[in-house]
């Protein structure tokens, strides 16, 4: 399986912060926002990663992540010249995907749970079709809402419904088999001129191949797309890290635990950050 991070948004809801710096490179507490979706892919065991970025941002991304060698993975980049919707990432990445399955994660979504690895394993077990996650919210009217049966099969999806059929929404993490490329190619733009990821999921549901993994109520999902949510996300990351002593979305730690890099490499990274708490954390792995 390959992984795609869609990190090409202008971040207009974060202006003027994102005029000089693109949104995925903004800090969320102690690390760049892009580390959070990257950590998800690493935790899922995905080592071939494509990051879709805005025009003119190749330099900053490459200075931060390079080609992935420091994490023992392969990272490549593609530019989304014009914002055409989330599903456009599947077309931009079609050559990268090739004959493989793919995991798509949004660049401003933050996921945290001590049981996250187990949820990812559940999603990866569905080798045919697609798998999304069901996240409980009290008021789902501003989101894409999914209804599913006792077997975890989606039975309805509604985008920002006035009267939701469930309290479960779909966060920005999607697992697809290889037929997703064909599905994306056959999409028609929506009324707002975009290729909607909801339409991709609806097609899988029509084929009775859309699976839903229900997340427990203690699972943390954050969308850091506005100034308030960015601040709240940073505060939550700090709160959890201070309380547990475990860093959220530390790519070096995940790569080390999975055997992608050795301790010598971790210590070299730690030495580069020796004046920071992040560097000291790496020293103790």
Outline where the language-model segments fall:
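Short, amphipathic C-terminal "tail helix"
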Residues: 261, 266-285
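Conserved N-terminal catalytic core of the sugar/cofactor nucleotidyltransferase
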Residues: 2-5, 13-16, 26-27, 31-106, ...
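A short acidic, often aromatic-flanked loop/helix-cap motif at beta-alpha or helix-coil junctions
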Residues: 83-86, 139-140, 163, 220-221
């Amino acid at each position: 399986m390959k992984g795609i991070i869609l990190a090409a948004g202008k971040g207009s809801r974060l202006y003027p912060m994102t005029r000089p710096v693109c949104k995925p490179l903004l800090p969320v507490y102690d690390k760049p926002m892009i580390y959070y979706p990257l950590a998800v892919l690493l935790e899922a065991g995905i080592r071939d990663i494509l990051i879709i970025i805005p025009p003119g941002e190749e330099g900053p991304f490459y200075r931060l992540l390079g080609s992935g060698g420091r994490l023992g993975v392969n990272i490549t980049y593609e530019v989304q010249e014009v914002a055409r919707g989330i599903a456009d990432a599947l077309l931009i990445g079609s050559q990268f995907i090739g004959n493989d399955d793919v995991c798509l994660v949004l660049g401003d979504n933050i996921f945290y749970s001590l049981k996250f690895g187990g949820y990812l394993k559940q999603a990866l077990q569905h080798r045919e079709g697609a798998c999304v996650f069901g996240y409980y919210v009290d008021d789902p009217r501003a989101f894409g809402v999914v209804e599913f049966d006792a077997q975890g099969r989606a039975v309805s999806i509604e985008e920002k419904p006035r009267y939701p059929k469930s309290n479960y929404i779909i966060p920005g993490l999607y697992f697809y088999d290889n037929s997703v490329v064909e599905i994306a190619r056959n999409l028609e733009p929506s009324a707002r001129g975009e290729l909607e990821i909801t339409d991709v999921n609806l097609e899988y549901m029509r084929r009775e191949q859309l699976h839903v993994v229900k997340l427990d109520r203690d699972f943390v999902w954050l969308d850091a797309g506005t100034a308030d949510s960015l601040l709240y996300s940073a505060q939550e990351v700090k709160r959890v890290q201070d309380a547990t002593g475990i860093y959220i979305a530390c790519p070096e730690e995940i790569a080390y635990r999975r055997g992608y890099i050795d301790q010598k490499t971790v210590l070299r990274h730690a030495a580069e950050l020796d004046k920071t708490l992040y560097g000291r954390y790496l020293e103790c792995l």
